[in-house]
Amino acid sequence: MVPVIALVGRPNVGKSTLFNRLTRTRDAIVGDLSGLTRDRQYGEAKWQGRSYILIDTGGISGDEHGMDEKMAEQSLLAIEEADVVLFLVDAKAGFTAADQMIAEHLRKRNKRSHVVANKVDNIDPEMARAEFAPLGMGHAIPIAGAHGRGITQLLEAALSDFPRDDDEPAEGEEEEVVAEGEEAKRIPGPSEKDGIKIAIIGRPNVGKSTLVNRMLGEDRVIVYDQPGTTRDSIYIPFERNDEKYTLIDTAGVRKRGKIHEEVEKFSVVKTLQAIKDANVVIFVMDAREGVVDHDLNLLGFALEAGRALVIAINKWDGMTPSERDFVKVELQRRLFFVDFADIHFISALHGTGVGNLYASVQNSFKSAVTRWPTSRLTQILEDAVSEHQPPMVNSRRIKLRYAHLGGANPPIIVIHGNQIEKVPKSYVRYLENTYRRVLKLVGTPIRIEFKGGENPYEGNKNTLTDRQVNKKRRLMSHNKKASKKRRDKK
């Protein structure tokens, strides 16, 4: 499971600066979800093959109401959700009573915590450690967040005990390559043992709990509750038609007979973790509310993670034909960026259309993990280039030479060529659509990556040998004499 790190501390100790520096290591910054969180900011980052979720909390003022109200509003939830807490203090301001109050609270929570002495510019790190020793939380880690000093040591302390990403090859290992002429196949993995992992996500009150209970209904063969490795997510293995599945339920434990949707406490962290751990994401929307910005934010999470996607429009029953037509138009207009995903109109409460989700889950998963040989992908590339060539750049045609598979779930197709940095986005979309159509991919995003060919002689000065210099002089002399003879004849 992806570890969660929370940044806590007084106002203006540099939490946001550190947050920005850490999340800048990846292009995907989750940012604020207006309306879902109050003063907390969520981001994703990666360090030495380890992905992690970062939470930036608002400052804890430390006044008579600060510890109660502020901590209850934002920092308390962040601490509860976190695997590691980074307690930031200001080395320039020194030890304060508010720091002591925060330290006491962290000790009561029994959370793995590190004191981080920020702003050690022009300050002796050893003096900073001694300054905050009375907190009783071990040696402080000195950093200068604004300049990036000490960040490596900080991340080593926070993340060294967590495993590398499952899909990240360990150092010295190479990714499996499909040999020439080999048939496309599914590569067995953890999902083969536990079944397809399905994360059901969506805004509060759209029917996630109802859908979970409906999918685990009377026709189930095997079902049991098993607490997952996160604080609230529940992993529920079950079978349907001899196929194994595991539901990742972020809505919490509920009684089996209780199928009405309760008002849920939305947790961005639980959703992010469920998406990361899933093979397929079922995204639930409320047909009566249509597409809202929060839906687009959550879809963005799933897209960034590259997970296969199925969209379920819930509460479809009871809507008039005109209302249904309006919703379909809105879906087509606002969800154009996930047009690869199957859309199902369901009623989780009554079970209408729920059974159809399984076929889409199976097809999406198969598309996401199938592998193809290099010869197949290269042939598709050659056909695409033949039908529609890349544009000219500085009077030179962009050359795309061959393609191979770079990863699965999502499929990553690596294309080698020249001037690849100048391939326009429109042509990238053309290639994505071509591969999707020819390979018949459904329900999964696809990523195109380019690699340029290295010129081994680039930067080398062309030095001629003495023999080559003499030969060049003879040729130049011969050309001059020939030119003179031609002029004399005229």
Swiss-Prot record:
Biased composition range(s): Acidic residues: 164-181
Lineage of origin: Bacteria, Pseudomonadati, Pseudomonadota, Gammaproteobacteria, Pseudomonadales
Subunit: Associates with the 50S ribosomal subunit.
Binding-site residues, GTP 2: 202-209, 249-253, 314-317
Protein name as catalogued: GTPase Der
GO BP of this protein: ribosome biogenesis
Pfam family, one: MMR_HSR1
Positions of the UniProt region annotated as Disordered: 162-189, 453-490
Source organism: Pseudomonas fluorescens (strain Pf0-1)
Function, in words: GTPase that plays an essential role in the late steps of ribosome biogenesis.
Membrane-crossing segments per the record: none
GO molecular function terms attached to this record: GTP binding; ribosome binding
UniProt biased composition (Basic residues): 470-490
